[in-house]
Structure formats: structure tokens, C-alpha cells
Design a protein with these regions (language model features):
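Short acidic-hydrophobic, aromatic-tinged amphipathic segments that line or gate anion-handling sites
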Residues: 56, 115-117, 209
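N-terminal nucleotide/polyanion-binding subdomain common to many enzyme families
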Residues: 38-46
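Short gly/ser/thr-rich secondary-structure transition/capping motifs
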Residues: 50-57, 126-127, 183-185
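Catalytic core of membrane glycerolipid acyltransferases/transacylases, capturing the structured
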Residues: 18-29, 33-36, 48-50, 64-122
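Membrane-interfacial terminal anchoring regions of lipid-handling membrane enzymes
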Residues: 1-33, 37, 60-63, 217-239
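Short, basic, glycine/proline-bearing loop/turn elements
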Residues: 43, 114-119, 149-150
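Non-catalytic C-terminal accessory region of glycerolipid acyltransferases
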Residues: 5, 127-239
């Protein structure tokens, strides 16, 4: 619990200061790049202070000079804070719509072109999210998404939602699969406690959705790539 309180203190304190100063500055400059870099530094600092070490491999697999869709498995609330600073380009994120209502943070996320997703929403809401994500890609940003849609209950890779793959086919952006492990033992689903440990991120070879006939085939290729790169105890039972 102490590690969680330390993490929250760093994020709330430094995040509020950065937001109060950085949001008006970014608005005047019409560029959120500096605020994004500061935010990633704050996230990395919080993770380190919580006793979490992040090991990253496979960055050579990330296409240079192209907007990508980074797709990772999802096992813990810690995943975004571990993953985002490791991505070697400025990214937008598909996230729960409710997070956009958080004071200061919500404003910063809107300025950063983060994409709200309405869980269990109607078809129109889903299409609006895909459109916003496509616009972010076209503007030169990459996208981070957890295609399972929610955290795995047992740490094993679960089924994928089709929405992110519709986005990939629509934009033809390369998909970079990411195998994430370690965070499932640091913060279990339903728990507020954080245990120190090592989080491992493995960036896998990019997958071009254009080489597949439909999004179902693309989905299977990405899911198989992630499954095969995960430790055996995290692999899905259907692979």
C-alpha cells in the first residue's frame, strides 16, 4: 500500500504542477510536445519510486518514421504507466471515457488527442472512437491500445476485441505487438497493493494489416505473435 501511496503522491503532486503550468503554455504555443515529454518523465519517475524496474527489448522492430498501432496484452492497472514511456514516439491512447472527466488530467489528455472509448457503447460511439484514432494516426501520432479491452483476470492472454483491427485495416498503419509480463504479480486485479518487481516489455516484429484479407486474420496473427512471446503461464489455453 505504501508503494501505491508513493506513486499517487508523485503523480498527483508533479502532475498537478505540470498541468497548471504546462497546459496554458502548450495552449499558447499550440504544441503539447513539451508537456507530453514532462508527463512521460513523471510517469517513469513514479514507476521507479514504486520499486518497479522496466526491461525493454525489441525496439529495433518499431518501424522508423511511421505512425504505428502498438498492441499489448493487459494484466494490471500498472500496464499503461509501464508501457507508455517505453514507446519511442509520441502516442495517443484509447482509454475509458470516464478518465477524461478528471480535473487537469482530462484537459491534458484531450490536448494530447487521447481517444475516449465508451465501454458497451452504441455503434455510433464506437465509430466515433475509430474515427478519432484514425485522425490521430494521420496527424503523425502513434496509438497504444490493449485489444483485450480489459485486464485479464488470471494473467493469461484472453480474447481480442475487433475494433482496433478495424482501425488498422482502415488506416493501413503497421501493428507492433507487445508482450508485457511481470506486472500481473505487482498489482493484482481488484487489489490496491503494489509489490516491487521487474516488468518486461518485448516489442515484436511489425505486422502489416494490408497483407491479410480481413480483420479477423489480422487479429489472429497479432494475438498469436503476442501469445508465443509470453511466458508459458501467461499463454492462452486455446493456443
Amino acid at each position: 500500500m505504501f508503494a501505491l501511496l508513493k506513486l499517487l503522491f508523485i503523480y498527483v503532486t508533479l502532475g498537478s504542477i505540470a498541468g497548471i503550468i504546462g497546459i496554458p503554455y502548450s495552449f499558447l504555443k499550440r504544441d503539447i510536445g513539451l508537456l507530453y515529454q514532462v508527463a512521460m518523465w513523471i510517469v517513469k519517475t513514479g514507476v521507479r519510486m514504486a520499486g518497479i524496474r522496466v526491461e525493454v527489448s525489441g525496439l529495433e522492430n518499431v518501424p522508423v518514421g511511421r505512425s504505428c498501432i502498438f498492441m499489448s496484452n493487459h494484466v494490471s492497472n500498472l500496464d499503461p504507466t509501464v508501457l507508455m514511456p517505453a514507446v519511442p514516439s509520441r502516442c495517443s491512447v484509447l482509454l475509458k471515457k470516464e478518465l477524461m472527466s478528471i480535473p487537469i488530467l482530462g484537459t491534458a489528455m484531450r490536448m494530447a488527442k487521447f481517444v475516449p472509448v465508451e465501454r458497451g457503447g452504441k455503434r455510433d460511439a464506437a465509430q466515433a472512437s475509430v474515427k478519432a484514432a484514425a485522425e490521430a494516426l494521420q496527424s503523425g501520432l502513434s496509438i497504444v491500445v490493449f485489444p483485450e479491452g480489459t485486464r485479464s483476470r488470471n494473467g493469461r492472454l484472453s480474447t481480442f476485441k475487433k475494433g482496433p483491427f478495424f482501425l488498422a485495416q482502415q488506416t493501413l498503419a503497421p501493428i507492433v505487438p507487445i508482450a508485457l509480463s511481470g506486472t500481473q504479480t505487482m498489482m493484482h486485479k481488484g487489489s490496491m497493493a503494489i509489490s516491487p518487481g521487474v516488468a518486461r516489455l518485448r516489442f515484436l516484429p511489425a505486422i502489416e494489416s494490408a497483407q491479410f484479407a480481413n480483420r479477423e486474420e489480422t487479429l489472429r496473427a497479432v494475438r498469436t505473435a503476442i501469445a508465443e512471446a509470453l511466458p508459458e503461464e501467461m499463454q492462452p489455453v486455446d493456443c
